[in-house]
């Protein structure tokens, strides 16, 4: 079972699951928030959130180590091993708390 912490929500799970599905198909690719938003809201219909919301959540997931960010100007992301471990229920809630808590 996945741990729940106050800063996480269903949008975070959907974003991580999207990246994990790509990886399970053999594609560990970097994506910016726009293609994640288009696919999650229009193609897959798993989210009803704005592109800005998806972008903010991806920044937060990267800050917490669940996504990895490259290219600081354009913001491309991919799932990390920690993100995969979260989806597999292999992390404790303490592993997901911000460093100051």
Per-range role (PLM):
Residues 1-28:
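Short alpha-helical segments that sit at the start of domains
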Residues 12-16, 49, 58, 77:
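A broad helix-preferring feature
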Residues 26-42, 47:
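Short acidic, hydrophobic short linear motifs in intrinsically disordered regions
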Residues 47-63:
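Short amphipathic alpha-helical interaction segments
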Residues 62-71:
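A short, conserved structural fragment
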Residues 74-80:
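Minor-groove-contacting beta-hairpin "wing" of winged helix-turn-helix DNA-binding domains
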Residues 82-101:
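Short, amphipathic alpha-helical interaction segments positioned at domain boundaries
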């Amino acid at each position: 079972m996945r741990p729940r912490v106050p800063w996480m929500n269903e949008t975070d799970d959907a974003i991580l699951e999207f990246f994990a599905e790509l990886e399970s198909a053999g594609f560990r690719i970097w994506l910016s928030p726009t293609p994640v938003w288009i696919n999650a809201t229009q193609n897959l219909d798993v989210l009803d959130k704005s592109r800005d919301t998806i972008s903010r959540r991806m920044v937060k997931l990267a800050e917490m180590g669940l996504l990895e960010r490259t290219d600081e100007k354009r913001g491309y992301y991919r799932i990390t091993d920690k993100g995969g471990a979260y989806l597999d229920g292999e992390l404790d809630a303490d592993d997901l708390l911000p460093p100051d808590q």
